């Protein structure tokens, strides 16, 4: 039987019912969220900054509150725990269903801790979520900021990176001039708000670039890094590939740096208007890669929301 926190002491039934409810896009109550996040914290605090992951696994990029597209992702990729998943951050903000999206992923983590890995993205932060929608959504759905606080406190425990079979390094953003090797990542103190600068910030904010070397990022955080940097990093750490998310790519995935780096983006028709495909990357037992592209799930009536979020695409 799949070992899980939910199944210990007979608690799985309640959690399974909650997962079923969440799959129908119905949020949990505030006390249920609090209990769930307490259990999740116990699991996540035991995980490494470079969390080891075995194949087969399906690697996913940004979701951004596009709940119905996450359900479509599970329909196409296989449901958890039949398929192992690795999500590379940015569960919240921009889409209309950040609450349901992040609650479902955390519930799956608690129920099947060995089957799903959830990394931190730059949007899993107190500051960013106050600007881009998650904070306002929590206020609207729960009447107070309590659930926002519960989740943003939990985000501090999400692992920063994962390592699939010692050869695919997965993270939300990209590389850092402060980090040459994986041990430098392992030694970071991650349990904090995402800093404005430094190695932890860079891992969640940086982007690959056509220009060599390190560059100043137009995002105002992190760096751009060239093919020379990726090649050196992969060589030093015996890696085949860096897989990351963080950037909208129209086909859902995009190779860079002569296939040393791949961007995976899993929110189709991003912000309900970009017209992009989404994709997920399946890594099988033999470590072969297959990209699966998908289009948006059929649109539901979107909730009546006053949009006051800036248009700058983080």
Curated annotation (Swiss-Prot):
Gene encoding the protein: PP2A4
Cofactor: Mn(2+)
InterPro entries recorded: Calcineurin-like_PHP_ApaH, Metallo-depent_PP-like, PPA2-like, Ser/Thr-sp_prot-phosphatase
Biological-process GO terms, alphabetical: mitotic cell cycle
Catalytic reactions of this protein: O-phospho-L-seryl-[protein] + H2O = L-seryl-[protein] + phosphate; O-phospho-L-threonyl-[protein] + H2O = L-threonyl-[protein] + phosphate
GO CC, alphabetical: cytosol; nucleus
Name used for this protein in its record: Serine/threonine-protein phosphatase PP2A-4 catalytic subunit
Annotated positions binding Mn(2+) 1: 62, 64, 90
Keywords of this entry: Cytoplasm, Hydrolase, Manganese, Metal-binding, Protein phosphatase
Residues that coordinate or bind Mn(2+) 2: 90, 122, 172, 246
EC class name: hydrolase
Family according to the record: Belongs to the PPP phosphatase family. PP-2A subfamily.
EC number(s) stated in the UniProt entry for this protein: 3.1.3.16
CC cofactor note: Binds 2 manganese ions per subunit.
PANTHER family linked: SERINE/THREONINE-PROTEIN PHOSPHATASE PP2A-RELATED
Gene Ontology molecular functions: metal ion binding; protein serine/threonine phosphatase activity
Catalytic residue list: 123 (proton donor)
Compartments where located: Cytoplasm
């Amino acid at each position: 039987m799949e070992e899980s926190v939910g199944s210990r002491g007979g608690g799985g039934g309640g959690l399974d019912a909650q997962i079923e409810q969440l799959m129908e896009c119905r949020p949990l109550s505030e006390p249920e969220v609090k209990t769930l996040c307490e259990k999740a914290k116990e699991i996540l605090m035991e995980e490494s900054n470079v969390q080891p992951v075995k194949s087969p696994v399906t690697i996913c990029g940004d979701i951004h509150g596009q709940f119905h597209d996450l359900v479509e992702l599970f329909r196409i990729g296989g449901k958890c725990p039949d398929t192992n998943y690795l999500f590379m951050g940015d569960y919240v903000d921009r889409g209309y269903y950040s609450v349901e999206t992040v609650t479902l992923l955390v519930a799956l983590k608690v129920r099947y801790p060995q089957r799903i890995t959830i990394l931190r993205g730059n949007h899993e932060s107190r500051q960013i979520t106050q600007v881009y929608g998650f904070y306002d959504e929590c206020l609207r759905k729960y009447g107070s900021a309590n659930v926002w606080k519960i989740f943003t406190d939990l985000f501090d425990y999400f692992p920063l990176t994962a390592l699939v079979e010692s050869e695919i390094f997965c993270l939300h953003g990209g590389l850092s001039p402060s980090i040459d090797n994986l041990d430098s990542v392992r030694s970071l103190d991650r349990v904090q708000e995402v800093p404005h600068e430094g190695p932890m910030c860079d891992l969640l904010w940086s982007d690959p670039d056509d220009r060599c070397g390190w560059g100043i990022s137009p995002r105002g955080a992190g760096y751009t890094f060239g093919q020379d940097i990726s090649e050196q990093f992969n060589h030093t750490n015996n890696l085949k590939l860096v897989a990351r998310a963080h950037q909208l790519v129209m086909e859902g995935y995009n190779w860079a740096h002569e296939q040393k780096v791949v961007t995976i983006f899993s929110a189709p028709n991003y912000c309900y208007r970009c017209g992009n495909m989404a994709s997920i990357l399946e890594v099988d037992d033999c470590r072969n890669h297959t990209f699966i592209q998908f289009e948006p799930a059929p649109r539901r009536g979107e909730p009546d929301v006053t949009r006051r979020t800036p248009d700058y695409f983080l």
